[in-house]
Amino acid sequence: MSIDNSLKAFKEAQNLIPGGVNSPVRAFKSVGGTPLFIANGSGAYLTDIDGNRYVDFVQSWGPLLFGHRDESIESAVIEAVKHGLSFGAPTQAESDLAALVISMFDSIEKIRFVSSGTEAVMSAIRLARGYTNCDDIVKFTGCYHGHSDSLLVQAGSGAATFGNPSSPGVPADFTKHTLLAEYNNIESVKKCFSDSKDVACVIIEPIAGNMGLVPADKEFLRELRELCDANGALLIFDEVMSGFRASVHGAESITGVKPDIVTLGKVIGGGMPVGAFGARAEIMAKLSPEGPVYQAGTLSGNPVAMAAGLAAITKLKQNGQIISVLNSRATRLVEGMQEAAKTYGIAMQIDTRGSMFGFFFNEKPVKNFADACNSDEKLFALFHSKMLKEGFYFACSLYETGFISTAITDEMIEDTIKASAKVFKEITNV
């Protein structure tokens, strides 16, 4: 398999774009390879500029629930473009998509659209602070909530600590109001509330996707809800990644825990840049122009993105059973790969939620970021590069989640399992 054209394109891009990419994970640094430059996507497949074709388990990092170039979404976008790209004024499509999402989430009575998941989370936290008149936020080590300054915080030793910036360019003053807790450890959250009497909100990925796939325990989420209620803090579920993938009705429908605010992204835009945050009407009433908490965006709710999102979410609501079908395929995939790994003496931990899947080369189950960090990154990098050569495109980082789309068939799943067995055999014979 030749990737000469990708090598050339990457070299050129590095002279023009920092690191050659517009989002760091795309650089393949975690797996030690060269990023593939993509020419097109169709259904379950990506084709690179060298003509190599891959079954795509990344799906643009989650948005493409129906695969590449879904006919109904593509048609909706083309029709919308005919009427204009952006107006900077309200359109009916915004209300239509809002009503659709509200009908699918019990916790959402009103919703505001933005252009990215980062914006959604940033705005949700500002809203929580404005609603509670408190400043501090609690987040969890290993949970990613976008790249806004207050959320780029390193972990401490595992106990809850006041945060320090994890990126140059983020002043310590910006993160001093961010407290860190350990995922799936309620005692660490209690310590945060003990350390601060000014907590506005606790933000969590109920199904974490950026330390690999690590779902929160239901009992942990229940206790988190109780802690927030007891301390007058809001509970935010960041479902930018898991929203509409783990369940049609959100993580609240499978955990039994209802958040105060939900953030959404990825699938809600059908492949176009859309984010959103929603809550009960009482909380959303604090948002401008109805209330004093300011939030705005030139391209928020733009008609093309709304058309794509409306087509995607309408199709999902009309075919809600597909989540269980995709979960069956995701489960078959990781169980098949786990069995193949076991045959060659390789330990693999697996999990799925809806159309999301994850695996770790680890002896023990993964419950938090520290567990994830104990996984074999070198083995993952080798597995990734060899699976690429077999024609299967997995996320280029151990700490990312995989995705199944409706375009990926049972036959493709079986082919992937067979390829993984071949790769594991090669790895153990190295």
From Swiss-Prot:
It comes from Sulfurimonas denitrificans (strain ATCC 33889 / DSM 1251). It is found in: Cytoplasm. The gene is hemL. Keywords: Cytoplasm, Isomerase, Porphyrin biosynthesis, Pyridoxal phosphate. Its main location: cytoplasm. Pathway: Porphyrin-containing compound metabolism; protoporphyrin-IX biosynthesis; 5-aminolevulinate from L-glutamyl-tRNA(Glu): step 2/2. The keyword Isomerase applies. The lineage of its organism: Bacteria, Pseudomonadati, Campylobacterota, Epsilonproteobacteria, Campylobacterales. Belongs to the class-III pyridoxal-phosphate-dependent aminotransferase family. HemL subfamily. Its EC number is 5.4.3.8. This is Glutamate-1-semialdehyde 2,1-aminomutase. One of its GO terms (cellular component) is cytoplasm. It catalyses: (S)-4-amino-5-oxopentanoate = 5-aminolevulinate. Pfam families: Aminotran_3. The modification N6-(pyridoxal phosphate)lysine is found at K266. GO terms for molecular function: glutamate-1-semialdehyde 2,1-aminomutase activity; pyridoxal phosphate binding; transaminase activity. Its cofactor is pyridoxal 5'-phosphate. HAMAP family: HemL_aminotrans_3 (MF_00375). PROSITE patterns: AA_TRANSFER_CLASS_3 (PS00600). GO terms for biological process: protoporphyrinogen IX biosynthetic process. Homodimer. InterPro entries: 4pyrrol_synth_GluAld_NH2Trfase (IPR004639), Aminotrans_3 (IPR005814), Aminotrans_3_PPA_site (IPR049704), PyrdxlP-dep_Trfase (IPR015424), PyrdxlP-dep_Trfase_major (IPR015421), PyrdxlP-dep_Trfase_small (IPR015422).
